[in-house]
Amino acid sequence: MKSQNSKEQKSDFSYKETLNLLKTDFSMRANSVLREPEIQNFWANNDIDFQLGSSNSGEIFTLHDGPPYANGALHMGHALNKVLKDIINKYKTLKGFRVHFVPGWDCHGLPIELKVLQNLKSDERKNLDTLNLRKKATDYAHIQINNQKEGFKRWGIWGDWNNPYLTLKKSYESAQIGVFGKMFLNGYIYRGLKPVHWSPSSRTALAEAELEYPDDHYSKSIYVSLKITKIPEEIQLNFIQKNINIKKDFFQNNSFITIWTTTPWTIPANEAVAVNPKINYIFAIDEEKRIYLFAKDLCSEISKKFNKDFKVLLEVKGSKLENIEYQHPSKNKNCRIVIGGDYITTESGTGIVHTAPGHGIDDFNVGQKYDLPITCVVDEKGNLNEYSGQFKGSNVLKDANDLIIEYLKVNNLLLLQENYKHRYPYDWRTKKPTIFRATEQWFASVNGFRSSALKAIEDVEWMPETGKKRIYSMVVGRGDWCISRQRSWGVPIPVFYKKNGNEILLNKEIINHIQELFSEHGADIWWDWDVKNLLPENYAKESDLWKKGKDTMDVWFDSGSSWAAVCELRSELKYPADLYLEGSDQHRGWFQSSLLTSVAVNNKPPYKKVLTHGFALDENGRKMSKSLGNVVDPNIIINGGNNKKTDPAYGADVLRLWVSSVDYSVDVPIGSNILKQLSDVYRKVRNTARYLLGNIHDYDPKIDSFEIDQLPLLDQWMLGRLVEVTDQISNAYENYEFSKFFQILQSFCVVDLSNFYLDIAKDRLYVSSKSQFRRRSCQFVMSKVVENLAVLISPVLCHMAEDIWQNIPYSTKEKSVFQRGWPIFSQSWKNKILNEHISNLRNLRVEINKAIEGCRNKQIIGAALETEVNYLPEDKALKDSLTWLKEFGNQDVDLFRDWLIVSNFQVVSDLVDNSLATDNNALGKIQINKAQGQKCDRCWHYQKETFNGIQNTKLCKRCSNIINFEFI
């Protein structure tokens, strides 16, 4: 009856107003769409952004920006690239380096030129001269740059946005002419007739970096028989020695060289066929008494393909076949067998290669050796010209192949036609096939400085290391670099040609003069001014003899000159740059073009370190494309989509967190599920920071600061853990291992703080007297944690970090988190013995919590404070740790009971009966019992001794004293 009566008299009075509850303006919800731009304005108005790094007193750190193309909307590839760079720059700024990040844009080239033309009506296109085209291209590029720039800034990227480098700027074009000029004067640039990758769809030559190689291209491959007209006496003697009696007339009328090609349209350009001198070839006769020449190792495959049974008449080394003559397949002339190289194999075909020196690099090289004609049968549109004879007017990408195949068939020269799937070069812009076509072009002779370039590669640190092997093999095997383009929107090659003849005018005086003119007036004057005004004064009298060249430079030469136009010219930067950071495709692009120009001019690489990242894919590992509907838009990640339920606004920091979470050295996935997971992590970090800020609202570090040995053991451990985490995160940033930062941050916020230190701290913070040491010491530690947590996350979660800093409730010397500098702690804060003991005790805490949670799940108890724990130790190290805690711990903070958040804990030698739960494990025996005594209505601890409180409430002795001294 008494117990029931006491329940009926239970008071509804709450001691909430007597507790030290959270107070902070740092909201639980980030509201990033509004708050992040406010923070960015704060940075801009207070010179916190890139100006901060520029004003540092340390060593210059230069991360040179590879220029994105000034066309189109920003995508996830941009986000991955620019955020990685920004993380590094912000970290270096905090470390005291002088960081001046100059963003850049690649502005010339065909895509912009085509965009301009597409936006014009037909009549406007016809009447458009070069200068107007260039003006429209300039205007278009600036619009694209401004759009992209605003996007980058919204991502929190710091940079010299008011003075970026643009490849269309006068100063840049002038510096680029300087690079070209020095390479020319060093003997590395020449003009010559040579097969180059030619895009009929773009009507210009292409560099290797402008090509794509899809795996699913099908070519019309053909096997062709070429009638032998003359055979050397040595081979005739071989037949005689083998007792093969074949009359000369019969042999010449019935013997054929067998070739295979995947480009039938080049047949009219044939000038020879090539064999490998090391391969064994056979003359084989079929049942129709026709003799064929092909590689011995391919006999079985050819027999199947032709559906013929062959009898081998004679085996001959390739080196012995030279000068066998045959009748050209479409022209009235004889050609011959020549000796080729290792490019001729027996992997496919016949082992004998159709050779058209005007339409292939290997063919060209063999042609040079044998002084063969360099016949080009195709014009700039891809149409066959007069040199193709009867096929003139047909197009290589349309009907030429079919016409030539039909011709060969009618003339009994076609042995077999079949589709052949292989990798084939496509124009990366138009997505259409390219061809090899011999034209007069300007080249950079890589042979002249290849060994220096390879040595420079060895001097650079490549991350990952595989990047070094990749670019090394590319430079070892690359041919001369075709740097001329037949387009209007680019930097002109500053050469003059004799009106009558092939003589060129290009020397040091002219190069320097053009460079000065471009510096003052820009490259447009090349089309605007006449020759007389472009030439130096002492050439004025002969200006009528010369005409301006029409070629522009490859855009890779544009961007590849950025070390000279940016790093070398700007005093706040340095050359070589500390770091280049781009996608892995740039080993054949910007990394390589920059390396080649820098080595050719200055005999050194333009960078000290090169870091590469993969590509952004969807969650299923597929390439993003509009057709698949799997494109992830960074703008939608930040601002949300039309349907905020399916596409919520996550803000820039979640985008940045994604970049830090992935192993960017390989291709990385992104999608809605990943974003939700990242948002959860972001929220946990934010809520951890909010809890820290909310509990130091009445803390003043000027009054309540402590030496570490004055603190309870738990607080000493927390500060030591802060030092360890800082060291780990520092190493992650230093080594560009940002995914480690992500993992360390998660573990620190969730495992060390939320689940352990802050969980235990609740009683100290809420229930203690405001100025009690157990509370102030905890606030001291929390202030250290929140200040340094803000700094540690600031390179990645820059907006949240600044938001935390602005909500620190006491005054700080620094206006911004980025002015604080990178944390430096005394290593004495780390205590190995303390760490070992607390690690043991945390392990025990985990096991006890499991047992308590089991009781809670069975609804035996509600809160853990309703229990008390008996522990029978079996682990010596753990027993020692409990003894250590009891001996050296602070009695107001370091009782293991309080670390468990139970009402009582005791080490026992025997367990009692009638427990709520018992658990036996390697650590010992754990027994969960119902807490004895009465519940304090203020702190909820169960105590055997309680006192009457307000309105029939019960208080423990501690809470009773606090209420009496502070509130009554």
Swiss-Prot record:
Record note on cofactor: Binds 1 zinc ion per subunit.
UniProt-listed PROSITE patterns: AA_TRNA_LIGASE_I
SUPFAM superfamilies: Anticodon-binding domain of a subclass of class I aminoacyl-tRNA synthetases (SSF47323), Nucleotidylyl transferase (SSF52374), ValRS/IleRS/LeuRS editing domain (SSF50677)
Motif ('KMSKS' region): 623-627
Compartmental location: Cytoplasm
Keywords: Aminoacyl-tRNA synthetase, ATP-binding, Cytoplasm, Ligase, Metal-binding, Nucleotide-binding, Protein biosynthesis, Zinc
Residues reported in the UniProt entry to bind Zn(2+): C936, C939, C956, C959
InterPro entries: aa-tRNA-synth_I_CS (IPR001412), aa-tRNA-synth_Ia (IPR002300), Anticodon_Ile_BEm (IPR033708), Ile-tRNA-ligase (IPR002301), Ile-tRNA-ligase_type1 (IPR023585), Ile-tRNA_ligase (IPR050081), M/V/L/I-tRNA-synth_anticd-bd (IPR013155), Rossmann-like_a/b/a_fold (IPR014729)
Annotated binding of L-isoleucyl-5'-AMP, by residue: E582
GO BP annotations listed: isoleucyl-tRNA aminoacylation
Residues binding ATP, per UniProt: K626
Pfam families: Anticodon_1, tRNA-synt_1, zf-FPG_IleRS
GO CC, one annotated term: cytoplasm
Catalytic activity field: tRNA(Ile) + L-isoleucine + ATP = L-isoleucyl-tRNA(Ile) + AMP + diphosphate
Gene3D superfamilies: 1.10.730.20, HUPs, Ile-tRNA synthetase CP2 domain-like, Valyl/Leucyl/Isoleucyl-tRNA synthetase, editing domain
GO molecular function (one): tRNA binding
Family note: Belongs to the class-I aminoacyl-tRNA synthetase family. IleS type 1 subfamily.
Function in brief: Catalyzes the attachment of isoleucine to tRNA(Ile). As IleRS can inadvertently accommodate and process structurally similar amino acids such as valine, to avoid such errors it has two additional distinct tRNA(Ile)-dependent editing activities. One activity is designated as 'pretransfer' editing and involves the hydrolysis of activated Val-AMP. The other activity is designated 'posttransfer' editing and involves deacylation of mischarged Val-tRNA(Ile).
Subunit structure: Monomer.
NCBIfam families (UniProt xref): ileS
Protein name: Isoleucine--tRNA ligase
Species of provenance: Prochlorococcus marinus (strain MIT 9301)
